[in-house]
Amino acid sequence: MKQAIAGVVAFDEEITVMIVYPSIAGAPGGIGKILGRLFNIQIGIKPLTVGNLIALASAPLCAGLWIGRVLPMNRLPIIGTLSKKLGLAPQRYRITTKAILSEDAFDGSTVQETIALDSFDEIEIAVDAGQSWYDCGDLIFKQAGAVTGRLESVSRPESFKAACIKSQMSFVGVKQAI
């Protein structure tokens, strides 16, 4: 059985530590962020606020956006071509024992971005107004103040940041020991 902890497996092996799917706040065209801003409207008496009523009415649209972010719609013959043109290719963020990857959500066959675990020393979380309702944010990776990578609309960014930092500390510690 393979362990998903840097330093426990052989240093040259790459094992998955954690996988997270982006929130629908990152949907193309900014529609997810627009909906998030609308859902945050607190006019009214809770739980019957304007934002909650808009969220209820737009549930089918949000379900469609979520399905488009997770399921491999880009692999279907006719819908796939359209989804690629609209930027609806589903993706996921995966922490391994060597890097943080932004890749194809279905099978990880296409990697869009790679952030090596030794290429950052700080991670910032930037939460846009349209992202706060979804409990998501952008993770900005920095090395000596310079941006080395960015992951957009990460669900529950605090826990993903903690996992990134733990993996980075383990990787760098093992690398220095070897």
Question: Where in the sequence are the language-model features?
Answer:
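N-terminal basic, Ser/Thr-rich segments that initiate or prime the first beta/alpha elements at protein or domain
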Residues: M1-I178
